[in-house]
Every structure is written in structure tokens, then in C-alpha cells.
Design a protein with these regions (language model features):
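Extended hydrophobic leader/signal-anchor segments used for secretion and membrane insertion
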Residues: 1-154
């Protein structure tokens, strides 16, 4: 049976290639759709996800949406609360995080994002454009320990 993904406006949907193999191979690939993690992640970014990884506050995680569990989303784990994780998008204006659906149970957190790859934009072939892309295309996704400070400011 094939995993299907739905669309929720403003929600970064992930189309994953290896979620089912996560139990055998702890690394998988995913693709971001949606604006809620801008400026950290953009629509079209490819992610390397470690399934079953230990999550700490500030980590970017892949999770099942609490109300639509066939939809995978990517958010930042802001803090652990009673009943699971409080997750937030890096783009405060996009919504679609724990401010909408509350605490996410631990069993819905699938893995931690370690690395992102940004595909080369079509039509940009000048040497300067290619050089800029080469320098920024692949980056580690770092934990942001200041997410808890952002949480207190809300």
C-alpha cells in the first residue's frame, strides 16, 4: 500500500521516499513543500532525515500531523511538554504548528533532519548564479536552541 500525502494550505508537506524503510535503514530522504520553515527550509528543499533519532529542543523534526496522520510535516521542536513536543515553524506568519494543534505526542515524531540540499533553479546558468548555488546548495540543518526563547516571547 502506498503512503499518500495530503495538502493543508500553509503546511509544509513532505513527500518522503524512504519512510517505510526507516526501521531497516535509519536515514531517509524527504522533500519540503510549503513556507512554514522559511528561512531555514524552502519549498523544494531535499532533506536527509534520521528516523528514530533522539530529539532535543531546537532540532528540526519530521512528524505526522496530529489530525491528518497521512500528512508528514517538518517543524522545529521547541520544547518538551506533558504529552509530547511543542513544535513551531520558523516562519511565524505561516502557522500550522502547535499553536494550531497543541502538543504533538512523542510517537508522531518520526525523525530528526540533519542535512538539506537545495536543487539548482532552472534557467540560471550564468557563472555567478552557478557559483552562488554551489556555495549554498548543501548545508547541515542546525539546531536552534533559541526556539525556547521565541516560545516565551509569544
Amino acid at each position: 500500500m502506498e503512503e499518500r500525502t495530503g495538502e493543508v494550505p500553509g503546511m509544509p508537506e513532505l513527500s518522503q521516499e524512504t519512510e517505510r524503510r526507516g526501521a531497516v535503514l535509519p536515514l531517509g530522504l524527504a522533500e519540503v513543500t510549503g513556507p512554514s520553515m522559511v528561512p531555514t527550509l524552502y519549498h523544494g528543499d531535499r532533506l536527509v532525515v534520521q528516523y528514530g533519532a533522539r530529539v532535543r529542543p531546537g532540532d528540526v523534526v519530521v512528524l505526522r500531523h496530529p489530525f491528518q496522520q497521512d500528512l508528514l510535516v517538518v517543524k522545529r521542536a521547541a520544547e518538551r511538554r506533558e504529552g509530547g513536543w511543542w513544535v513551531l515553524g520558523d516562519n511565524a506568519y505561516a502557522g500550522g504548528d502547535s499553536t494550531d494543534y497543541g502538543t504533538v505526542p512523542e510517537e508522531l515524531i518520526l525523525g530528526k533532519v540533519w542535512f538539506r540540499y537545495r536543487p539548482r533553479p532552472a534557467g540560471r546558468r550564468s557563472p555567478l548564479a552557478v557559483a552562488r548555488w554551489v556555495l549554498s546548495a548543501a548545508r547541515p540543518v542546525l539546531s536552534d536552541r533559541s526556539a525556547s526563547r521565541r516560545l516565551r516571547a509569544r
